[in-house]
């Protein structure tokens, strides 16, 4: 699998085909037992903010429950009013803890955190699966607009063929190659 800056690729397959495992390998969360993951011909950096950011399906597992949400966003650098506004993140939410927000609100924070990191490659692992259709559309429209502005590559990991066709220029069907 090769991702180019600015590309929009969907990794599509039914549940159980290893989509999330592959996403975690590509983002550096797991180490491959064979082969390698390279970024511009070199291994992913081991220190600093990684230019490959993974956004998981379950935002409650990706946020420290003891941190207020402003601190969660500050992990990736300075707060960006334009990103907060784009995702409809209210300033009052910044003083709250994760347990005080809905899953959709938390997912907005996870996506905003990844975008504020200066990522060059964004891996979106089923980021809208459990959200209502309005929140799904808002998140994807914002992610795609930001990716376009920044020439950022998007890898959308999904089991939803309609979503893959709507957001991606290329669809990699794991069921056909595994």
Located regions from the model:
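Conserved ABC ATPase signature
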Residues: 97-101, 105
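Helical segment within the ABC ATPase nucleotide-binding domain
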Residues: 137-150
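Q-loop/switch helix immediately C-terminal to the Walker
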Residues: 58, 65-79
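Conserved ABC transporter NBD signature motif
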Residues: 35-48, 176
